[in-house]
Curated annotation (Swiss-Prot):
Pfam families: Bac_DnaA, Bac_DnaA_C. This is Chromosomal replication initiator protein DnaA. Residues 1-76 are annotated as: Domain I, interacts with DnaA modulators. It comes from Mesoplasma florum (strain ATCC 33453 / NBRC 100688 / NCTC 11704 / L1). GO terms for molecular function: ATP binding; ATP hydrolysis activity; DNA replication origin binding; lipid binding. ATP binds at residues 145, 147-149. Oligomerizes as a right-handed, spiral filament on DNA at oriC.
């Protein structure tokens, strides 16, 4: 969208939604000019210093309206024309910043977003676009291997691309620097370190839980937090648990952690795990094609964290080396390849759980369900398990066949059809099916 058209649209939205007094809109907004610096940075040129002061009171309204139009967060600054031109001249005199990221850099572009992490991703983008505003500090928590470090690195990289000065440290690096300064026995060393950290516009600290019970480090840390928040500079922290569950920190530190925004990265859901597997396969350059149901199988059974996914793809690459380029990796291949790998049981809804619940109901074994015996109880248990694999897990008939002793897809379709007919004809059987389904999905 052209800048002029964007500005007109924003003004019309502001008038319509009445979040700002109409007199202010006419006096200070309509008479202003929108300048696009980049896709994530805009400056609004205001006629007077008074106008700048007034519009700054509505900065969050502008950020919200830009988000509603552009579908992404942007930074917005209000300046007079004189100040803007003065700043532009200063910027032109600066040495150019090297903004070229390495191919393997962790960025927002290569962070796979799904329902398990979309809140954290949105919050991370927001603090880059609007540092030091509402979400300060930003506290991202979740188990190891879910992408916290990737998001923190993405914040660092994007903020630096935007020309911000950023310090990123692990808690181990942070502690080591403080201890080294303290060991020198000179207070000036501590002050120098404090000054160095405070000179940044972003301070990003990974794995703050490891600062637990480090009193001297935490005293220093608390002073840093105060300086950044008081000066409108952005803090970003990560941890394996929420602030409330952190042990070994005094109450004032927990209060500080909670004073901005705490947002989780949850366990990977199957669709997100599938996207990450596909992205990693593309990145690693697997030569052979791989069928979608094979990828889904991996996502459902082995992809409880990102690091494990990289290991899975490495095994696929090695498998590919051993086979012709024309070989298409299918479900049977991956089932055989990972048969000795413990299942992560992602989301706890899987074929194994279905078989366990149904086997218990019909008093048969899982081995019997997978086998060839055709007594009434075993046949009903087998067919019902296949039916649930279809309606609950949305598995393909080929995939179901592979998971039930290597049966072909026509056998699976026949079994599912038989169960559907029984549900339609027999009310008691329908009740049994509903009861088992609720038990499987945890209702």
């Amino acid at each position: 969208m052209e800048t002029k058209a964007l500005w007109e649209k924003l003004i019309n939205k502001l008038k319509k939604e009445k979040l700002i007094d109409q007199d202010i809109i006419e006096e200070y907004i309509v008479t202003s000019e929108l300048i696009k610096i980049s896709n994530t940075e805009f400056v609004i040129l205001v006629r007077s210093n008074l106008g700048v002061t007034i519009l700054n009171e509505f900065k969050e309204v502008f950020v919200y309206e830009f988000k509603s139009v552009l579908n992404s967060y942007v930074s917005v600054d209000f300046l007079t024309k004189e100040i803007f031109e003065k700043n532009t001249k200063k910027e032109n005199k600066k040495e150019p910043i090297n903004t070229v990221l390495s191919e393997n850099a962790l960025t927002f572009e290569n962070f796979i977003v799904g329902s398990s992490n979309k809140q954290a991703n949105l919050a991370a983008k927001n603090v880059v676009a609007n540092p030091g505003m509402s979400f300060n500090p930003l506290f991202i928590y979740g188990d190891s291997g879910l992408g916290k470090t990737h998001l923190l690195q993405a914040i660092k990289n994007q903020a630096e691309l935007n020309g911000k000065k950023v310090l990123y440290l692990t808690s181990e690096e942070f502690t080591k620097r403080i201890v080294n300064a303290l060991n020198k026995g000179d207070l000036s060393e501590i002050e120098e370190l404090k000054t160095e950290i405070n000179s940044n516009e972003f301070f990003i600290l990974d794995d703050v839980q490891f600062l637990s019970k480090k009193d001297k480090t935490n005293e220093f840390f608390f002073n840093i937090i105060n300086n950044f928040t008081e000066n409108g500079k952005q803090l970003v922290f990560s941890s394996d648990k929420t602030p409330e569950l952190l042990n070994g920190f005094d109450k004032r530190m927990i209060t500080r952690f909670n004073s901005g925004l705490s947002t989780p990265i949850n366990a990977l859901d199957i669709p997100t795990a599938k996207l990450i597997i596909e992205a990693e396969i593309k990145k690693q350059g697997l030569k052979q094609k791989i069928k979608e149901d094979a990828v889904v199988y991996l996502a459902q059974n082995f992809s409880d964290d990102v690091r494990k996914i990289k290991g899975l793809v490495n095994r696929l690459l090695f498998f590919g080396i051993q086979n012709d380029l024309g070989h298409i990796i299918d479900l049977e291949d991956v089932i055989d390849l990972f048969k000795d790998t413990p299942s992560a049981n992602l989301g706890l809804l899987n074929v194994k759980k279905i078989k366990e619940v149904v086997a218990k109901k019909y008093d048969v074994t899982i081995k019997a369900i997978d086998g060839k015996a055709r007594t009434t109880a075993i046949k009903n248990a087998r067919h019902l398990s296949m039916y649930f694999a279809k309606i609950i897990l949305n598995h393909t008939s080929t995939q179901i066949g592979a998971e039930f002793g290597g049966r072909d897809h026509s056998t699976v379709l026949s079994a599912i059809s038989r169960i559907e007919k029984l549900i339609y004809k027999e009310k008691e059987f329908k009740k049994i099916v509903e009861s088992l389904k609720n038990e499987i999905i945890g209702k």
